């Protein structure tokens, strides 16, 4: 998925039919216009970083918006990236600025603790200093829609990113239908959502999650087998 667009940018890549071993030869990078075939923040971030060294403006098109940490941080450090209907990356005309940052908690890791709190009767859990980027907290919206009580507080910013504390209180859970634009923001949390669904009082259905088959393993298959 990354070889094709990088080749279009002028990178010479030798691979074993798209698999390892792989050789990459440095070259002058060209600007491109490219539509990501699958919603993938990893592929998008690779192309953004490459585009910073391009010879002109690169335009990336997403069918569904994915997490935007790369764009936020690079803009805070001096890059010129705009993101509306398309992502437009201008090549760097100066070095990125040095920075200090307190790295917030990862929402995907926090999802396991939040799930335990939602399932255990009379639980009341607060997770502090958690990243609250809107493209990453879809899980907490899902948890709330399933019936848990979810409250955000102490909101602030760290290098352009929203950070806060989240409180979860247990309540009986109901099933939910998940599809479309929310999927990229919960793609890593679907396995734990599947576990929550086994304890809900009605069925849960997840659609448009084909990206799970292209992770380090086929996570859809793993979810079905493990549960």
Annotate each PLM feature.
Residues 1-226:
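Structural preference for solvent-exposed beta-strand-turn elements
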């Amino acid at each position: 998925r990354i070889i094709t667009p990088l080749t279009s940018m002028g990178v010479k890549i030798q691979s074993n039919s798209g698999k390892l071993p792989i050789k990459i030869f440095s070259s002058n990078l060209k600007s491109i216009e490219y539509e990501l075939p699958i919603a993938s923040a990893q592929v998008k971030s690779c192309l953004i970083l490459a585009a910073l060294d391009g010879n002109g403006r690169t335009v990336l098109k997403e069918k569904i918006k994915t997490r935007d940490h790369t764009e936020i941080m690079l803009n805070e450090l001096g890059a010129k990236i705009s993101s509306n209907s398309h992502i437009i990356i201008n090549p760097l005309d100066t070095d990125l600025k040095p920075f200090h940052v307190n790295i917030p908690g990862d929402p995907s890791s926090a999802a396991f603790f939040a799930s335990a709190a939602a399932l255990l009767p009379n639980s009341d859990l607060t997770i502090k200093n958690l990243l609250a980027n809107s493209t990453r907290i879809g899980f907490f919206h899902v948890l709330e829609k399933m019936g848990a009580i979810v409250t955000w507080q102490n909101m602030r910013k760290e290098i352009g990113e929203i950070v806060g504390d989240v409180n979860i209180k247990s309540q009986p859970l109901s099933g939910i239908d998940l599809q479309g634009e929310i999927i990229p923001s919960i793609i890593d949390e679907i396995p734990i959502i599947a576990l929550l669904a086994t304890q809900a009082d009605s069925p849960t259905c997840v659609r448009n999650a084909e990206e799970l088959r292209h992770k380090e393993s086929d996570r859809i298959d793993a979810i079905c087998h493990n549960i």
